[in-house]
Swiss-Prot record:
It is found in: Cell inner membrane. GO terms for cellular component: ATP-binding cassette (ABC) transporter complex. Belongs to the MlaE permease family. Could be part of an ABC transporter complex. It is a multi-pass membrane protein. Signal peptide: none annotated. Disulfide bonds: none annotated. This is Probable ABC transporter permease protein RF_0080.
Length: 259
């Protein structure tokens, strides 16, 4: 019994170590491909539209209602201590530091990450990736590089727009539902907001963009055979990206806001 448990743990440990090593080599190959021609500018532009522009409605809806709910819930709690004047500050700091980047990252991971993994996994199953080798084309440069660059560029843009829309959601609830004075609410919103709050969120967004793109590409590139392999690659991309987003969010927060 104990021997079987030890054997199972050993196999899982070795498999995990192999996965970490494989992912590290894949990430290094993707990053190092930046300095090698060609640039594939048309592919980058296509991915900028897919990852950025087409994800904007999802991110906008998520952040708008998150800001609105945050204002509503903050009022419910702060009114017990007569601290309603702090609601606007809580909304803007929560969105710019944490909720904006994390929610945008999770939404993009669900929408874009799944799509990237499924697309590359399908190409792997149908041997299109092998065909790139026969055409003397580096698959990582052709498939991974444009998606990684596009995700790193577009995620901060999405987060910045999402922050603005989320603050608008909180403003509309605060002014038109909770009867706050418009000028006082806006003054409170920007009084305690500092550049580091916005910068930390944008740095997180760039890191999240890299995480989503590289994990999704890796999951698709090394997918199993058949429809089951494509499904597992898609699930793995979304789950692993989401987990790493939350972990890296804590680490970056610790880096920027040391207590």
């Amino acid at each position: 019994m104990l021997l079987n448990i030890a054997n199972s743990v050993g196999k899982r440990t070795i498999k995990f170590a192999q996965s970490v090593g494989s992912f590290s080599l894949f990430s290094f190959a993707a990053v190092s491909s930046i300095i090698r021609p060609p640039l594939y500018l048309s592919l980058i532009i296509r991915q900028l539209l897919f990852i950025g522009f087409h994800s904007l409605p999802v991110v906008a809806m998520t952040t708008f209602f998150s800001g609105a709910v945050l204002a509503l819930q903050s009022y419910t709690g702060f009114s017990r201590f007569s601290a309603e004047s702090s609601i606007a500050t809580v909304v803007v700091l929560s969105l710019t530091r944490e909720l904006g980047p994390v929610l945008a990252g999770l939404m993009v991971a669900g929408r874009v990450g799944a799509s990237i993994a499924a697309e590359i996994a399908t190409m792997r199953v149908t041997e299109q990736v092998d065909a790139l080798y026969t055409l003397s084309t580096d698959p990582i440069k052709y498939l991974v590089f444009p998606r990684v660059i596009a995700a790193i560029i577009t995620m901060p843009c999405l987060v910045l727009i999402g922050d603005i829309i989320g603050v608008m959601g909180g403003y509309l609830v605060g002014v038109y539902k909770l009867d706050f004075n418009s000028t006082a609410y806006l003054t409170s919103t920007f009084h305690y907001l500092e550049p580091i709050d916005v910068i930390s969120g944008l740095v997180k967004a760039g890191v999240f963009g890299f995480i989503i793109s590289i994990i999704s590409c890796y999951s698709g590139y090394y997918s199993g055979k058949g429809a089951k392999g494509v499904g597992r690659a898609t699930t793995s991309a979304v789950v692993n990206s989401s987990i790493l987003i939350l972990i890296s969010n804590y680490l970056i927060t610790e880096l920027f806001f040391k207590v």
